[in-house]
Amino acid sequence: MRQIAFYGKGGIGKSTTSQNTLAGMAQNGNRIMIVGCDPKADSTRLILNTKAQVTVLHLAAERGAVEDLELEDVLLQGFADIKCVESGGPEPGVGCAGRGIITAINFLEEEGAYEDLDFVSYDVLGDVVCGGFAMPIREGKAQEIYIVTSGEMMAMYAANNIARGILKYAHTGGVRLGGLICNSRNVNRETDLIEELADRLNTQMIHFVPRSKQVQEAELRRMTVIQYSPDHPQADEYRTLAKKIEENTKLTIPTPIDNDTLEELLINYGLLGSEEEYKKVMEADMATQALTRATSINK
């Protein structure tokens, strides 16, 4: 059994990408379980064709304790017989969101949910790699990490941060980076940019997923593209990514870069102005504001 994880910043399309990819892997005959580790609990809805799955933490709070739950209470089966669990999180502003991940994984292990599987996939929020969110990495649960990113600055910043988290536990937990998945935002020279970032991080861009309205069309119906429109070219993109992950042997210890190097990369690809350009823009802004203030005073 291989344990993989999809990490990425919020809003990058991580859950959509992972569910479409896992649907392709399941169609190839793999027995799969998804463990959603995002407080939004949206890691399984396209597989289950539902709004949001009831989470382990929510049910545990209702029943009194996680020990009062049965496996069938939290584990549902969806498209292509993919098993689905959502760990959930606490009320906003209260407690640690990562606690749900730890609680859910421990419960699933104790209940034998990991038996007879080819892949377990963790779908994890990656804006911050705090102790709870890093749990699949830290405890060696996830052996292969796939980072969903794009050519946008904050997505790349998050990818580099996640690489730092992987490096921290690579020697103790045995976790490795499987590659970057570029979920395209139609940024100029996006393929080249992510390939260079991957090279700097000592990994590969395992696949470039083009932007397509078909993804949103399928999402409106709470389906993956593979289920909603199996003959569409976008479905083939996810099948290709699925095959690449199944056959991937390039698992590496990442080499994160510092923020200055990342900024330099963005400047080289024209996505960020140089320090001189930044100063000019700021000076122009200040001059405009001063002129506006002077005009309003004269009135």
From Swiss-Prot:
Comment on bound cofactor: Binds 1 [4Fe-4S] cluster per dimer.
Reaction it catalyzes: N2 + 8 reduced [2Fe-2S]-[ferredoxin] + 16 ATP + 16 H2O = H2 + 8 oxidized [2Fe-2S]-[ferredoxin] + 2 NH4(+) + 16 ADP + 16 phosphate + 6 H(+)
InterPro entries in the cross-refs: NifH/chlL_CS, NifH/frxC, Nitrogenase_Fe_NifH, P-loop_NTPase
PTM description: The reversible ADP-ribosylation of Arg-99 inactivates the nitrogenase reductase and regulates nitrogenase activity.
Gene Ontology biological process: nitrogen fixation
Binding-site positions, [4Fe-4S] cluster: C96, C130
Residue numbers binding ATP: G8, K9, G10, G11, I12, G13, K14, S15
UniProt xrefs under Pfam families: Fer4_NifH (PF00142)
Enzyme Commission numbers on file: 1.18.6.1
Signal sequence extent: none
Sequence positions bearing ADP-ribosylarginine: R99
Alphabetic keyword roster: 4Fe-4S, ADP-ribosylation, ATP-binding, Iron, Iron-sulfur, Metal-binding, Nitrogen fixation, Nucleotide-binding, Oxidoreductase
SUPFAM superfamilies reported for this sequence: P-loop containing nucleoside triphosphate hydrolases (SSF52540)
Assembly notes: Homodimer.
Stored NCBIfam families: nifH
PANTHER family reported in the protein's UniProt record: LIGHT-INDEPENDENT PROTOCHLOROPHYLLIDE REDUCTASE IRON-SULFUR ATP-BINDING PROTEIN (PTHR42864:SF2)
Its biological purpose: The key enzymatic reactions in nitrogen fixation are catalyzed by the nitrogenase complex, which has 2 components: the iron protein and the molybdenum-iron protein.
Protein name: Nitrogenase iron protein
Source organism: Gloeothece citriformis (strain PCC 7424) (Cyanothece sp. (strain PCC 7424))
Organismal lineage: Bacteria, Bacillati, Cyanobacteriota, Cyanophyceae, Oscillatoriophycideae
Gene: nifH
